[in-house]
Every structure is written in structure tokens, then in C-alpha cells.
């Protein structure tokens, strides 16, 4: 499967020079040839070439994640799991080749690459996070959404063991469904809900929890209001807990990129299972792989879901093809292909 994403070049700083002219001054037009030469020289020193931009992006973004991807592939080879060898091969081939389209004065576009779609893949997790961010940024900038107030909600419960994690994720999903049907939440007109999983490094327990952006009317706080204590009681009830869980709720003046990034981040941080010894990484991957396989961690409801249908054709924010640019204007551009060198750990340009 091929995907297309745009890599935007950093914009050159624009400098405007204002010249005050006296009434008796005569404006002299510069020689067009010398001016063109000067402009070209200025451009070459201030505007990086497309391939320079590509190399910078490869070094800063793609190569570190591909190295982690290769490490994870080796973990899957050693893992004692069904289908682990197949996933190891898919991981190794993920983003192995990157084809860019370049043209002078245009941002470089990645027009071909492959995705393994292994949930724990660092490359796919990164791209999935970008896709989620892009989708939600569009939705939350639409007039139908910006006219609402917004709340940022975090719902938690006690940690669980690795053996309990799968069942706990199912409980959380069912509890959220019950929560959204409660009369107390009739003031919530839409939401984005994501599930994040963190791991306690000392105990090895897992902490799945919900982050959500809630859209409420402008009258919220005057006519209706849900206190933090009420949120605790509601979550305890729908989760069937015998204690009051920790809950955080705060009003958001405006849904900014930072807010969207909070719900668009990785479902499981790669550092939780990659920055370990090979044996520990293998243990954690074996605990997580089957539990996370095939699960969705982002869901939309109410006006957020409706706007997503209008703006993004209803695609799930996690879909990697949200990074696809299908305008076709790059068809006649020059193509450059980079292949990952497993020995040196860098992408190298191929002759095509």
C-alpha cells in the first residue's frame, strides 16, 4: 500500500524594506539582468534546495524512527508469539524505500512508501499520530465547533497487570459508551476520546486511561455544570468500581494545536518498550502485541463526528491515508528515491 504525505519546507523569512521618497526624487529601475542575478544569489543562500530539506527531514525524523523499527523487528524475530515472524518481515520492509517528488520553489512531497500497520511500529505510530493531529486540527477549526466551549477530561482507574490489560481496555470502552448515554452528559454536544496506555517501570503494571475533549454550549457553567466530584462518581459508576477514581477536568479557552496534540499522541509510547534491554523489550512486546492488535484508540462523537464526516469524509483520525496528498500536481516533478541502509542506519539516494 502506498501513501503520500507532504513535507513542507521551512518558509524563508520575508523582509520588507520601506523607502521614504521625497517629492522631487526620481525612482531609478534596477538593471533587470543584474537584479535577476542578485535574486538568484539571494535565493541560493536563503532557500535550501529540496534535496537538502529531504536529507534534513530524513536525519531528524525518519532515520531515528526507522532504527527503532529495526530494533523492534529483531524483537519480533526472537518473540514467542503466533505470526511474530510475519510481523518482523513487515516491520523490516516498513518505510524501507521513500520516493519523493521535487520541484524548484515547491515543498518536497513523499509520494511512495509502505506501511506495515503493526500497532507497535515506531514509524507507523508516528505517522498515525500525525494523521490524527491533521484530522482533528481541521475539525476543531470549523465554525460549527469553534462556537462551542470545550473541556479537557482525563479519566483514570487503578493500574492492572499485563494479564488483565486486554479485559481492562474492553471495560473502559464499554464504560465510556455507558457514560455518554447518561442524562448528566446531555450538555456534551460532541467529543474526541483517546485511550493512552503507560507502563509503571517499577511494578510492570499498566495504566490505561482516557483523554477527551468535550464540546459544550456557551451557557455551560451558568445553566449546567458537572463538578469534579460528579465526574468521579459517574466514572466510578459506569466502570463498576468500589472507589472514587482520579479524574481531571478543566475548561479550555480555545482548542489549540497543543490541546489537539495531547489527544493525538501515541497510544503507547515507544520509549516504554524500546528503551530497554533486548530481553525486557521482548517481554513487554509479548505482553502488548496481541492485546493492542486491531484495536482503535481514537473515537469521535456528536458534532465532532458530524464535522469529521463533512471535512474528512468520515475517515477515522488514525487512518494513515489521512497523510495522502492526491492532487496529482507532482506527477511531472522530478522523482528521487531513498533506500534505508541497514548497515549504516541512514537513508541513501538511489540512482533511478
Residue ranges, per PLM feature:
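Right-hand nucleic-acid polymerase module
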Residues: 1-206, 216-352
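Cys/His-coordinated zinc-finger cores
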Residues: 212
Amino acid at each position: 500500500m502506498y501513501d503520500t504525505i507532504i513535507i513542507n519546507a521551512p518558509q524563508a523569512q520575508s523582509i520588507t524594506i520601506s523607502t521614504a521618497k521625497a517629492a522631487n526624487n526620481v525612482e531609478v529601475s534596477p538593471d533587470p539582468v543584474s537584479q535577476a542575478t542578485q535574486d538568484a544569489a539571494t535565493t541560493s543562500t536563503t532557500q535550501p534546495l529540496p534535496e537538502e530539506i529531504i536529507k534534513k527531514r530524513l536525519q531528524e525524523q525518519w532515520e531515528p524512527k526507522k532504527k527503532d523499527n529495526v530494533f523492534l523487528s529483531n524483537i519480533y524475530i526472537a518473540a514467542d508469539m503466533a505470526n511474530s515472524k510475519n510481523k518482523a518481515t513487515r516491520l523490516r520492509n516498513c518505510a524501507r524505500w521513500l520516493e519523493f517528488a521535487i520541484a524548484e520553489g515547491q515543498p518536497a512531497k513523499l509520494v511512495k512508501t509502505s506501511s506495515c500497520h503493526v500497532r507497535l511500529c515506531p514509524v507507523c505510530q508516528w505517522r498515525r499520530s500525525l494523521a490524527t493531529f491533521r484530522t482533528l486540527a481541521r475539525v476543531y477549526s470549523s465554525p460549527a465547533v469553534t462556537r462551542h466551549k470545550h473541556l479537557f477530561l482525563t479519566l483514570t482507574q487503578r493500574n492492572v497487570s499485563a494479564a488483565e490489560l486486554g479485559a481492562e481496555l474492553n471495560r473502559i470502552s464499554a464504560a465510556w459508551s455507558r457514560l455518554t448515554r447518561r442524562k448528566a452528559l446531555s450538555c456534551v454536544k460532541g467529543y474526541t476520546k483517546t485511550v493512552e496506555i503507560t507502563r509503571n517501570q517499577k511494578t510492570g503494571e499498566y495504566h490505561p486511561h482516557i483523554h477527551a475533549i468535550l464540546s459544550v454550549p456557551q451557557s455551560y457553567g451558568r445553566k449546567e455544570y458537572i463538578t469534579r466530584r460528579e465526574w468521579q462518581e459517574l466514572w466510578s459508576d459506569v466502570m463498576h468500581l468500589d472507589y472514587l477514581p482520579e479524574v481531571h477536568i478543566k475548561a479550555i479557552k480555545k482548542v489549540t494545536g497543543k490541546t489537539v496534540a495531547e489527544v493525538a499522541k501515541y497510544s503507547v509510547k515507544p520509549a516504554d518498550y524500546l528503551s530497554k534491554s533486548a530481553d525486557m523489550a521482548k517481554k513487554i512486546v509479548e505482553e502488548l502485541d496481541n492485546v493492542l492488535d486491531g484495536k482503535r484508540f481514537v473515537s469521535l462523537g456528536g458534532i465532532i463526528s458530524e464535522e469529521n464526516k463533512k471535512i474528512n469524509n468520515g475517515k477515522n483520525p488514525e487512518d494513515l491515508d489521512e497523510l495522502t496528498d492526491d492532487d496529482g500536481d507532482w506527477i511531472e516533478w522530478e522523482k528521487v528515491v531513498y533506500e534505508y541502509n541497514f548497515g549504516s542506519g541512514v537513508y541513501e539516494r538511489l540512482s533511478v
